[in-house]
Regions:
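The AdoMet/dcAdoMet-binding core of the Class I SAM-like
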Residues: 1-2, 50-187, 191-205, 209-211, ...
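Soluble small-group transferase modules, centered on the S-adenosyl donor enzyme superfamily
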Residues: 1-39, 47, 212-277
Length: 277
C-alpha cells in the first residue's frame, strides 16, 4: 500500500493480508494486516491502526474533555471507527450523536476492526437504544439544521485534499462557525506539524484563530498529528484549566498525563509566528 505524504514523499505499508477492499459510495476502504496490526485505509491513506489508534484518539478527545469540564452532550462528525464515541461515554457523556455520511464504511469498521464499535454496539447505536445515536448523514447538513447544544463537537475526517472533495468544506471557517454556535468546545484533527507536510496545519490554525476567542494546540508526542480545540468563550489560561481537571477526569487516559499536557500544548514556532504578523 503506497500512501502519499507530501510532494516526492510516499510511505509504503506492507499489507500481509487484505481483510476487505471495498469501494463505497464515498471512498475506497481497505482493512488489512500490517506490522501495526489490523489497519484502516481510506483512498490509500492510513486512517488508524490497531497499534497506534489509542494514542491518536486520546490526543483528539482528552484535551477537549478537559477544556469542557462537565460533559453530557457530544457531537462526533466522522471518526467512523467509533472509538471517540466510546471514550466520550466513558467520560460521562449521557448522549452522543455520531454523524458519518458513509454507512457502509462504518459497518465494515465494526465488522472487521478489533477496536471501536462492535457490530452489536453499532446496531444499538443505529437504533438509538443507548447513549450513542448513529446518524448516516452529511455532517454539514446535520450541523446546519441542528437545534441541540453540545458540550463538545468533534470533527475527525480524512485529511483535507488539494483537489475538490466533499469533506473539504468541513474544514473551512463557515463550518467551524456553525459548530461554534452549537458547541462550547470544538476540536478537530488539524494536520501534521512536520515541516514538509504542515500546510493543512497552518490553514487550520488560521481558521480556528479567526473563529474562536481561545484556541488550544495539542501535538501528539507519539503520533504524527496535531489537534486544535476552540472555545466559544475566552479563557486566560486554558492549559492550567486542563491540568487542574485531569486528576478528576472520569475517562482515565493511558497516553496523556500532566507533563504531556504542558509539553504538547506549545504550538510549533511557525504557528506562533503567524500570530505576530
Amino acid at each position: 500500500m503506497a500512501e502519499p505524504l507530501a510532494p516526492g514523499l510516499t510511505r509504503i505499508w506492507d499489507v500481509s493480508e487484505v481483510i476487505c477492499d471495498v469501494d463505497t459510495d464515498f471512498q475506497n476502504l481497505v482493512i488489512g494486516r500490517t506490522h501495526q496490526g489490523v489497519s484502516l485505509f481510506s483512498d490509500g491513506e492510513r486512517q488508524s491502526t490497531e497499534f497506534s489508534q489509542l494514542v491518536y484518539h486520546e490526543a483528539l478527545l482528552v484535551p477537549a474533555l478537559l477544556l469542557a469540564g462537565e460533559v453530557e452532550q457530544v457531537l462526533v462528525i466522522g471518526s467512523g471507527e467509533g472509538v471517540v464515541s466510546q471514550q466520550a461515554v466513558s467520560a460521562g457523556a449521557t448522549h452522543v450523536d455520531h454523524v458519518d455520511i458513509d454507512r457502509e464504511a462504518v459497518r465494515l469498521c465494526a465488522q472487521y476492526l478489533p477496536y471501536g464499535y462492535t457490530e452489536d454496539e453499532l446496531r444499538r447505536a443505529e437504533k438509538g437504544s443507548g447513549p450513542i445515536t448513529m446518524h448516516y448523514r452529511d455532517g454539514w447538513e446535520f450541523v446546519d439544521r441542528c437545534a441541540t447544544s453540545y458540550d463538545i463537537v468533534v470533527i475527525d475526517l480524512p485529511d483535507e485534499r488539494t483537489e475538490a472533495v466533499q469533506h473539504n468544506r468541513l474544514y473551512h471557517t463557515d463550518f467551524l462557525r456553525r459548530c461554534r454556535d452549537i458547541g462550547r468546545v470544538v476540536v478537530a484533527q488539524a494536520g501534521c506539524p512536520t515541516l514538509w507536510r504542515n500546510e493543512s496545519l497552518h490553514l487550520s490554525w488560521q481558521r480556528f484563530r479567526e473563529t474562536f476567542p481561545t484556541v488550544v494546540y495539542f501535538g501528539s508526542d507519539e503520533h504524527e498529528w496535531a489537534f486544535l480545540s476552540g472555545l466559544a468563550e475566552a479563557c486566560e489560561d486554558p492549559v492550567a484549566r486542563m491540568s487542574a481537571r485531569l486528576p478528576t477526569l472520569p475517562y482515565r487516559s493511558l497516553t496523556i498525563d500532566a507533563d504531556t499536557l504542558i509539553a504538547s500544548t506549545v504550538p510549533p514556532k511557525s504557528l506562533r509566528a503567524l500570530d505576530s504578523r
